[in-house]
Amino acid sequence: MITVGIVAAHRDWTVAVPRNYVDCVLAAGGVPVLLPVSLTGARLSAAVDHVGALLLAGGGDVDPARYGERPSATLDKVDPERDECEIQAFRLALEKGLRVLGVCRGAQLMAVATGGRLVQDLPSAGFGGHLDVHRDRTYAGLRHEVKAEPGTRAERVLAGLDEVNSHHHQAIAEPGELLEPTAWSADGVIEAVEAANLLGVQWHPETAAGVDGRHLRAFHWLTGGDRGVPDEL
């Protein structure tokens, strides 16, 4: 069984990740291992040495200073410590050839870590419908259409799924040096990026998997499992 490292952010007096991520890794045959966000340097490297894959979870906004921009008035709370830990963990995973799955913020962080940049606020950038369609602070499960590039990993993960859930006000503007956009919403927002051993999705498969097991495909890809996932994924 493969171990999957998940960076655990500070939450009050604890370090934690939402349980949905843990449950999805378990359902895909993996063993979730939490990596405290306070890990740095040699300790972080040692921790990544002991996992077989990396999961970058959703969360707050990435600090725009990471991609050379000033914060917009709509910026949510940032966590520089988490940004640093996850970027370094991602780069270590790249060096070791580990599979990496980024979800929402995690996909955005992958882009930033490889020289990309983000749309800081979709409505302010002219994606007016996204205020309602792409973000719902009540977590009521808003959905929108998504279309993947034929022959890509995103297409295989999305097979049979024409819609995904949505909870974000930021998105990838430029994917950086390694990642290629492979899925988009109807209004052109990047919904998936990928490269060898890398997959980033803008939606939240971990919250949808409890209702529709097809959303576990991204996690089966991460763990190398074969249940419901083509070998070529």
Question: Which stretches of residues belong to each language-model region?
Answer:
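NAD(P)H cofactor-binding loop motif with strongest signal on the N-terminal glycine-rich segment
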Residues: 106
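Short catalytic/ligand-gating loop segments at beta-alpha or beta-beta junctions
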Residues: 164-170, 193
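Alpha/beta hydrolase fold serine-hydrolase catalytic domain that processes acyl esters and thioesters
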Residues: 157-159
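Short, surface-exposed beta-strand/loop micro-motifs that present aromatic residues
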Residues: 189-195
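N-terminal beta1-alpha1 cap of cysteine-dependent amidohydrolase-like domains
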Residues: 1-103, 112-119, 123-143, 147-155, ...
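Beta-strand-turn-beta hairpins that frame and shape the catalytic cleft
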Residues: 178, 195-198
